[in-house]
């Protein structure tokens, strides 16, 4: 599984960071999934390998502008490029009203249907052939969710010794079993794929968090999770000065939580625009990493715009070169 950061700034963009957006795919950009769509997201996409024509679904964590203001432009551009495939939009109900109002009041139209799915439904679940997605309620000034992406339909390995022992000769039936299909033989026997195949590895799981001041809400979902992507808007000293109203997390909060549940990989994002990236800048963004490392002993990453990460089948996370 791979994911690319399209924006890592909180609230407003900076010269080096756009507002929130994340592209995620299982094994290549056809199809892919977008989590949040801040202003300028479609511009960021033009510097990556992801195309709006192959976009399968958009997942919106909450209604704040730095997470949704890029939607009208992205959707109408896809239409102008000739998209016809339906697009799922998983989001709070207000997002549908926002999109429809923007399109209605700008003499715009779409060449493809939008399928709106309420992210706040108590029984929310979404899936396609590649991933299954659940979500977790977070703590923010408005309703907010984290999305949990779990790999589906893992490749199967034939139990050849059992097939041979049961007198099942190699042939098309073996291929069907390996694809997860049950097979009815000419002699009337029903072969169940689960009996003659095994899945030799663990399904990969990634949590993509929205804005949240209580990382502990993700405790249950973190069990069996291999990567947590979570906001770290401030260092703790700044969070203390700002006070509780913004309802964001500090690097210290997230790191302590990740350590407590033994998450193997933590990727921090959504940094306040006050943090500078240039050498000598102050306060510097590296202060967030330094604070987190005091409390977290796993693999820590500080996201940058256009950074691409790959979670391998052996569950190791690697940061690749900038996807530009």
Model-derived features with residue positions:
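Active-site metal-binding loops of divalent metal-dependent hydrolases
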Residues: 8-9, 39-40, 63, 94, ...
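Active-site-proximal loop/helix segment associated with metal-binding centers of metalloenzymes
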Residues: 14-16, 129-208, 212-220, 227-229
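Short, surface-exposed amphipathic charged segments that create phosphate/polyanion-binding patches used
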Residues: 126-135, 313-324
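Active-site neighborhood of divalent metal-dependent phosphoester bond hydrolases
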Residues: 83-87, 92-118
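Active-site metal-binding motif and surrounding structural segment of the metallo-beta-lactamase
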Residues: 39-90, 118-119
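Cap/insert and terminal regions of metallo-dependent hydrolase folds
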Residues: 178-306
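Metal-dependent catalytic neighborhoods of phosphoester/phosphodiester hydrolases
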Residues: 70-77, 102, 276-290, 313
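Conserved beta-strand hairpin/beta-sheet module of binuclear metal-dependent hydrolase folds
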Residues: 1-50, 84-86, 147-149, 156, ...
């Amino acid at each position: 599984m791979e994911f690319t950061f399209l924006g890592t700034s909180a609230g407003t963009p900076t010269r080096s960071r756009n507002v929130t957006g994340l592209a995620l795919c299982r094994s290549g950009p056809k199809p892919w999934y977008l989590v949040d769509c801040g202003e300028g997201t479609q511009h960021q996409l033009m510097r990556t390998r992801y195309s709006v024509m192959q976009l399968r679904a958009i997942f919106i964590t909450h209604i704040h502008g730095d997470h949704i203001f890029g939607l009208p432009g992205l959707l109408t551009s896809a239409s102008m490029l000739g998209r016809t495939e339906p697009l799922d939009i998983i989001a709070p109900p207000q997002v549908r009203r926002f999109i429809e109002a923007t399109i209605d009041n700008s003499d715009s139209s779409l060449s493809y249907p939008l399928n709106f799915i309420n992210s706040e439904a108590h029984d929310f679940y979404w899936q396609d052939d590649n991933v299954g997605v659940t979500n977790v309620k977070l703590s923010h000034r408005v309703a907010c969710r984290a999305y949990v992406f779990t790999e589906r339909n893992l490749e199967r390995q034939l139990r050849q010794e059992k097939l041979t022992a049961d007198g099942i000769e190699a042939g098309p039936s073996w291929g069907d079993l390996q694809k997860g299909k049950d097979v009815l033989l000419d002699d009337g026997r029903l072969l169940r794929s689960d009996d003659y195949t095994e899945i030799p590895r663990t399904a990969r799981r990634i949590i993509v968090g929205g804005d949240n001041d209580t990382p502990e809400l993700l405790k249950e979902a973190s069990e069996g999770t291999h990567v947590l992507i979570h906001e770290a808007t401030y260092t703790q000293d700044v969070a203390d000065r700002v006070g509780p109203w913004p309802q964001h997390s500090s690097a210290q909060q997230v790191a302590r939580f990740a350590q407590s549940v033994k998450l193997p990989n933590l990727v921090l994002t959504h940094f306040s625009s006050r943090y500078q990236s240039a050498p000598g800048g102050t306060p510097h963004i590296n202060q967030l990493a330094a604070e987190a490392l005091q409390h977290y002993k796993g693999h820590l990453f500080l996201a940058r715009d256009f950074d691409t990460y790959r979670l391998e089948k052996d569950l190791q996370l690697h940061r690749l070169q900038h996807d530009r």
